[in-house]
Design a protein with these regions (language model features):
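Extracellular low-complexity Ser/Thr/Asn/Gly-rich intrinsically disordered segments
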Residues: 1-217
Length: 217
């Protein structure tokens, strides 16, 4: 009698967010077999324990899920005697991948908050861009972080804190945005935008003008 070894749950990101993905269960089959002879045993997948026990309604491979969370029942049987079988189950989970919408270039005037309004450095409240990144997506489902490189955004490292003071890149710098599914952080996308800081001009004192009107008009 074959042994239905433990199969890890599947967690997949849905890039087009239609809730449907294709599964071939190749890795799941390797886990079920766990070294048992694949020529001596057959593995099938079902949507209920009863179907797995009776070997009915086996799922076609590739399988396209109908719900974002499903329990899959696995049957492994001896090809020489199909009454010798074992079953196990695992969960299939599909998560939405958020869209990182375009953020327009942000332009701001330098100020005296740091004592110098001509050094191209000022605080920017990055969280003010969250709505632009979301563009209608549910903020409760996704987390947004800001980074100074694409690599940091992809690896979700070195997130910069809002408000951010650009003490290393005066006048202009790029910000890389990561938006991820709060339930499955591997489901994410990124975008980037530029922040330009302009020197605030000084309005110097102008002397009053006094003129004579020769024709008195």
């Amino acid at each position: 009698t074959p042994t239905a070894n433990t199969v890890e749950d599947l967690f997949e990101c849905d890039d087009d967010n239609d809730g449907v993905l294709s599964f071939d269960f190749a890795e799941s089959q390797n886990q079920v077999l766990a070294g048992q002879d694949s020529t001596a045993f057959s593995v099938t997948y079902h949507l209920s324990q009863e179907d797995a026990d009776t070997n009915t309604n086996a799922l076609a491979i590739p399988y396209f899920n109908t719900n974002t969370t499903e329990q899959i029942f696995v049957r492994i049987e001896n090809n020489a005697n199909t009454s010798c079988f074992d079953t196990t189950s695992f969960n299939l989970n599909v998560f939405d991948t958020p869209v990182a919408n375009t953020v327009q270039t942000y332009e701001v005037c330098d100020d005296l908050n740091d004592g110098d309004d001509a050094n191209g450095q000022t605080e920017v409240i990055l969280t003010d861009f969250n709505n632009e990144v979301l563009n209608g997506q549910d903020a409760d489902l996704f987390d947004i972080t800001y980074h100074l490189s694409q690599e940091d955004a992809d690896t979700n490292t070195n997130a910069i804190v809002s408000p951010y003071y650009n003490n290393g890149a005066p006048f202009s710098y790029q910000v890389f945005v990561r938006i991820e599914n709060s339930l499955k952080v591997e489901c994410y996308s990124t975008t980037e935008f530029t922040i330009n800081i302009y020197t605030t001009p000084t309005a110097n004192t102008v002397e009053d003008l006094f003129e004579c009107d020769d024709d008195n008009d």
